[in-house]
Amino acid sequence: MFKNLAGSFRAVSRVAFKTRPSLVRSYAAFDRSKPHVNIGTIGHVDHGKTTLTAAITKVLSEKGGANFLDYGSIDRAPEERARGITISTAHVEYQTDKRHYAHVDCPGHADYIKNMITGAAQMDGAIIVVAATDGQMPQTREHLLLARQVGVQHLVVFVNKVDTIDDPEMLELVEMEMRELLSQYGFDGDNTPVIMGSALCALESKQPEIGVQAIEKLLDAVDEHIPTPTRDLEQPFLLPVEDVFSISGRGTVVTGRVERGSLKKGEEIEIVGDFDKPFKTTVTGIEMFKKELDAAMAGDNAGILLRGVKRDDVKRGMVLAKPSTVTSHKKVLASLYILSKEEGGRHSPFGENYKPQLFIRTTDVTGTLRFPAGEGVDHSQMVMPGDNVEMEIELVRKTPLEVNQRFNIREGGKTVGTGLVTRIIE
């Protein structure tokens, strides 16, 4: 849909801790006997995303595949903000017979936008929740557009609140409209599974055919329709930093989703950020979902305990990387695709010295866009919505960057383009 540039926007998912993490105590080892998949709920506000997440944990808890978390346990963002910890995604762990899932639920709409665009809620697939009472709504469409932009290719639809609808034709209409909408945004509208049910009925153990049985059908559809992703384990380790904690007497923990490679306890690692020279440290512990890991691998949402690093030395947007594999830069050449008005982008063209926000992995940074220097370049030309264009980008601060690094371009609260770094200039 977005030419060749709107592929996977790789980044990390935030790990949600109920309390500050106390890494690597007497935790059991993490079981890797099943494939690990990152999934999430998207959709319009109040359509039942968090209720559905709670219902999934309830149904699976009765089979030993999850710990039941009620709505309040998942939707704890206000409590966390009051304590000064801005954990804006909730991570829930569960297992089906076939897979282990990390499920991300962002209770607030603003959190969704921020986390989907920076890739903090990067998913291998998603469940889009739509209320039978409303059908598709503005945020349904916005989240579909965002999912497409950040590289989510596989969805399952859950039509929620069917217990409040008496007219079967209304449900058919909601399904038909959703299939059309999916096709409009570049998804497989004809073959995407659409499950009808009521998350509330599942939570309250009422009307099993639209309650518990619907949740079971949904999980079967997720198992079957969302492919197990191929993880990039051969490349050098890289983890974009999502959050940082300090543990008294132990050190500093950084959390994030491993983008590629693997990391073992005791290995040396480099912290790369907006400073001139990266600094090295040693990994003293690795944890995922309160289970100890010998190694973190691509796709894991991990907490990494670092030796001799102060809390203020590391911040969101930096990366942990295998030494000498990643460097920070201020100026790059990039191939850009500017979204058309119909794709949710700008309505008007822009010229040289345009200064949007660039969302790169887990950071956002202002950049100035200019046409590359060279003979015959018209520096007064305009870039139109829908154009593919090559431009130089100068960032306001050094940022960890690589050739083939993907990023999103944002302005005024919406995505206006996508980009791919083609050359490092300085």
Curated annotation (Swiss-Prot):
G-protein that, in its active GTP-bound form, binds to and delivers aminoacyl-tRNA to the A-site of ribosomes during protein biosynthesis. In the presence of a correct codon-anticodon match between the aminoacyl-tRNA and the A-site codon of the ribosome-bound mRNA, the ribosome acts as a GTPase activator and the GTP is hydrolyzed. The inactive GDP-bound form leaves the ribosome and must be recycled before binding another molecule of aminoacyl-tRNA. Required for mitochondrial protein biosynthesis and maintenance of mitochondrial DNA. Belongs to the TRAFAC class translation factor GTPase superfamily. Classic translation factor GTPase family. EF-Tu/EF-1A subfamily. Transmembrane segments: none annotated. Gene3D superfamilies: P-loop containing nucleotide triphosphate hydrolases (3.40.50.300), Translation factors (2.40.30.10). Pfam families: GTP_EFTU (PF00009), GTP_EFTU_D2 (PF03144), GTP_EFTU_D3 (PF03143). GO terms for cellular component: mitochondrion. This is Elongation factor Tu, mitochondrial. GTP binds at residues 43-50, 105-109, 160-163. It is found in: Mitochondrion. Residues 84-88 are annotated as: G2. PROSITE patterns: G_TR_1 (PS00301), G_TR_2 (PS51722). GO terms for molecular function: GTP binding; GTPase activity; translation elongation factor activity. Residues 34-230 form the tr-type G domain. Residues 198-200 are annotated as: G5. One of its GO terms (biological process) is mitochondrial translational elongation. It comes from Meyerozyma guilliermondii (strain ATCC 6260 / CBS 566 / DSM 6381 / JCM 1539 / NBRC 10279 / NRRL Y-324) (Yeast). NCBIfam families: EF-Tu (TIGR00485), PRK00049.1 (NF000766), PRK12735.1 (NF009372), PRK12736.1 (NF009373), small_GTP (TIGR00231). The keyword Protein biosynthesis applies. Residues 105-108 are annotated as: G3. Residues 1-27 form a transit peptide. Keywords: Elongation factor, GTP-binding, Mitochondrion, Nucleotide-binding, Protein biosynthesis, Transit peptide. Residues 43-50 are annotated as: G1. Pathway: Protein biosynthesis; polypeptide chain elongation. Residues 160-163 are annotated as: G4.
